[in-house]
Regions:
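Sec-dependent signal peptide hydrophobic core
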Residues: 4-9, 332-336
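Generic hydrophobic alpha-helical segments
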Residues: 7-11, 68, 118, 149, ...
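Active-site-adjacent loops and short helices of periplasmic peptidoglycan-processing enzymes
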Residues: 18-173, 183-184
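Hydrophobic h-region of N-terminal signal peptides that target proteins for export
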Residues: 6-18, 341
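Domain-terminus/edge residues, biased toward the C-terminal soluble/receptor-binding domains
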Residues: 147-148, 157, 163-337, 341-356
Length: 356
């Protein structure tokens, strides 16, 4: 009986105490939290480790576009020419066609909500004339913002590099600086990064839905951007404002989307309590925005939710779904725990009876 009891206790020790244990064990490559009112660092862990930003870098695209709008060289209502180079981009997209015309602002929404790589390329060509010219603008802006030499942009979209190409590189600290500067220079940024849904085209119908699951789930969250491809892991730049305090968190290189989102939520909530408070307007509401104008016919495509899959070269829409069978494992653990508890109870009761 003693041997049986020892075996049962050993098995019980092997049952995980919590399904969330991996979050605290190895949640990310690096992370940082900034006080948006003062710029002070409230938390950092591996904040200078270089990693791949993936689609998060589209916030730099937005920065450059909004800079040009403020300067007057670009208008939000300007029509954007769609070229074959634009329509051949893979990954997450809105499937732009050379027969179509969309405005700068419509493509900005596609950039932030759908994480559309074709929209990123279209905006890059519209602003700079060439892809390489826009990438130069990105790196010049990085220097202007005082980002470290580690941060190097090689593309307007953040897709995995092809043969002979170099990857986009940044650090959590540099990217948090970028986000802070973007919000300060262009408060209207939050109008785009807080949008969770928008109809991009009417015929055939194409609806865009955000990849940022913190929106609508974390009170006060109004941005900013997620990123993912296989080698990059799951990353997010997020911001929350409550009661005059605002914090920005960047989490890079998580091995799982849920781990990334849980860690970002934890950091935002914890360090918002330590942030300075100044009078500020309420956060931008994450509301359904009006549909874009109808464009020329485009091929019917699957929605982003239907295009999940880790093998796709897509920095956001390929966030793989949770593996099937997770609920069965949970039920199995519960049943195993109940069985072990019953066996232990019977063993103890038998020992007491024998001892009388």
């Amino acid at each position: 009986m003693k041997k049986l009891l020892l075996i049962v206790l050993a098995w019980a020790a092997m049952v995980p105490a919590s399904r969330g244990a991996p979050i605290s064990r190895d949640p990310y490559l690096g992370a940082i939290v900034l006080d948006a009112n003062t710029g002070a660092v409230l938390f950092e862990d591996g904040a200078d480790r270089p990693g791949y930003p993936a689609s998060m870098l589209k916030l730099m695209d937005l920065f450059i576009v909004l800079d040009r709008v403020k300067q007057g060289s670009v208008r939000l209502e300007d029509p954007v020419l769609i070229t074959k180079e634009v329509s051949s981009i893979g990954g997450s997209q809105v499937y732009l066609d050379p027969r179509e015309k969309f405005t700068v602002e419509e493509l900005v929404y596609a950039l932030m909500i759908q994480s559309a790589n074709d929209a990123a390329m279209a905006l890059a060509l519209h602003v700079a004339g060439t892809r390489d010219g826009f990438v130069r603008m990105m790196n010049e802006k990085a220097k202007e913002l005082g980002l470290s030499p580690v941060t190097q942009f090689q593309s307007p979209h953040g897709l995995p590099p092809g043969a002979g190409q170099r990857p986009d590189i940044t650090t959590p600290r540099d990217f948090a600086k970028l986000c802070l500067a973007l919000i300060r220079a262009h408060p209207e940024t939050l109008k785009y990064t807080s949008a969770t849904f928008r109809v991009f085209r009417q015929e055939p119908l194409f609806e865009m839905r955000t990849h940022n699951r913190l929106l609508g789930n974390v009170p006060g969250c109004d941005g900013l951007k997620t990123g993912y491809f296989t080698d990059a892991g799951f990353s997010i730049a997020a911001t929350v404002q409550r009661d005059g305090a605002r914090v920005i968190a960047v989490v890079m290189g998580s091995v799982d989307r849920k781990v990334r989102d849980a860690k970002a939520t934890e950091l935002l909530g914890r360090y918002l309590l330590d942030a300075s408070r100044t009078p500020a307007p309420p956060p931008a509401p994450a509301v359904r925005t009006p549909p874009a104008a109808s464009a020329a016919a485009a091929p019917a495509v699957a929605t982003d939710d239907e295009a999940q899959g880790e093998d796709l070269p897509d920095p956001d829409a390929d966030e793989p779904a949770e593996k099937s069978g997770g609920w069965l494992k949970s039920v199995g653990l519960v049943v195993l725990g109940a069985f072990l508890a019953a066996v232990v109870g019977m063993a103890i009761q038998r020992r007491l009876l024998l001892g009388r």
